[in-house]
Each structure stands twice: as C-alpha cells, then as structure tokens.
C-alpha cells in the first residue's frame, strides 16, 4: 500500500481552512501544515495544538516554494511514497483521492 502524506501551506488563514484540510486529513498517512503567515492567528494555533497534524512554522512569509519544500522534506523523512500538495483554499473529494490507487 502506498504511503501518502499531504502538505498544506497556510498564509493568514481564516476558519474555513480547518474544514478544507479536514476533507483530506483522514485520507493520508501524515498531514503536514506549513504556516507561512506573518503572525499566528487562531487557525494557526488550532493546527499547532491538534495532534493529528504536523505543524511547521516558517516564522513569517518565506515564500510558497520554501514552505512546500519544508513540508515535503518532512514527508520525505517519514518515507512517504507520494506527496499531496494543497493550498489552504483547496478541498479534496474522496472520489478524487480513491482514483490515485487506480494508477498503474
């Protein structure tokens, strides 16, 4: 079975981001949230404190490439076979996820 991790980059997120990430967090083996915000807000603190997420604080806006690299490096260190990269506004329907397993 493939080991799949997700990497979601945050930038000044609003509360809707939590429900967006929750559409796919249980579909992956590891769910990394990389915070690229200038200041932490209540959403940042939620991901930092919730044990079902790996929270990486970039300590300010380092750019999306640096944030994605940080998340993917973490997933690589955990020997994930695939990385699902998402932005904070994205949802992931279960049917789309299941299609991954049909790839030859």
Model-found features: residue ranges?
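Conserved short acidic donor-positioning loop in nucleotide-sugar-dependent glycosyltransferases
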Residues: 35-38, 62, 89
